[in-house]
A protein has these predicted regions:
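The feature captures the beta-strand-to-loop junction immediately N-terminal to the Walker
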Residues: 30-35
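Helix-to-loop junction immediately C-terminal to a conserved catalytic motif
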Residues: 48
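ABC-family P-loop ATPase nucleotide-binding domains
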Residues: 77-134
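ABC transporter nucleotide-binding domain
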Residues: 165-252
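Conserved ABC transporter NBD signature motif
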Residues: 56-67, 71
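Catalytic Walker B motif of ABC-type/P-loop ATPase nucleotide-binding domains
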Residues: 147-151
Length: 273
């Protein structure tokens, strides 16, 4: 189990994580959503022990994570950027094998062949999507007990996305893998996660289970220009403004959302994935 209690972090004088609480159950998949600047990446860097909190506690298997080598060896972390790109996938694998006693060479070979990656080529010549696949091959070959992913399918084509999700779901079912996924795409998470947490201004504001997400949680973009509008009849989980356009995640039925917004004659109104 991953448990975060009262996590607090200040960076450059700004409160990034504000007494945050969350829990990820063993063998479950938890989706973490929130606007840019909400603190998703900072939270993840605490969960994997890269950053030390100013206050609060982070436990995995009831043990603190920071400077805990044994716990870190059980964590697989795939970030938005890959490191050590000046060497080949094969050379990276040798490093991972030395670092992780649970390294599975047979699985590594299966994965890079499945994703059709050349293990002898330098990773720096790979496209962004290929680098993501390379990271996935390496991390999944460590046979992690906890998998933490920051925008894991960004830049992947549809076939690669399906393969990534297949391996993750299979490991959850077969090995009781525990997964936390940070994503901006609500629809992408819909058929994958057991729960979703909405991170906003450094706090988990709302949590939902999968069935509830499918029927009551909707992401929209809307613009009314300079017109004053009233959205008090909608339960807005969070909102993000991009000029005159608002990005909203709303906890409500789609029919009520269409009625409340449609009655106010929006210039733009789209249901987003």
């Amino acid at each position: 189990m991953i448990k975060v209690k009262d996590l607090y972090k200040v960076i450059d004088g700004e409160v990034v994580l504000d007494h945050l609480n969350m829990q990820v159950e063993e063998g479950s998949i938890y989706g973490l959503m929130g606007p840019n600047g909400a603190g998703k990446t900072t939270l993840i860097r605490h969960l994997v022990g890269v950053l030390k909190q100013d206050a609060g506690k982070i436990f995995i298997e009831s043990q603190p994570v920071y400077e805990n080598i044994e716990i870190k060896r059980k964590i697989g972390y795939i970030s938005d950027e890959m490191y050590f790109i000046e060497t080949s996938l094969e050379r990276n694998a040798k490093v991972y094998k030395d670092l992780y006693p649970s390294w599975n060479q047979e699985r590594f070979e299966e994965l890079y062949k499945t994703f059709k990656l050349n293990p002898t080529k330098k990773i720096q010549i790979f496209s962004k999507g290929m680098r993501k696949q390379a990271s996935f091959c390496l991390i999944m070959s460590t046979m992690p007990k906890y998998l933490i992913l920051d925008e894991p399918i960004d830049g992947l084509d549809p076939i690669a996305r399906k393969l990534v999700w297949k391996y993750i779901i299979d490991d959850v079912a077969q090995r009781d893998l525990t997964v936390l996924i940070s994503s901006h795409n609500l629809k992408e998470l819909e058929g994958i996660v057991d729960h979703v947490g909405i991170l906003y201004k450094g706090k988990i504001m709302k949590e939902f289970d999968l069935e509830y997400i499918q029927t009551h949680i909707h992401k929209i973009q809307v613009s009314f220009g300079d017109k004053e509008v009233h959205l008090d009849d909608l339960n807005i989980a969070y909102q993000e403004e991009r000029g005159s356009v608002k990005i909203l995640i709303i906890e409500d039925s789609l029919s009520n959302i269409r009625k409340v917004i449609g009655d106010q004659s929006p210039l733009i109104f789209d249901i987003l994935p």
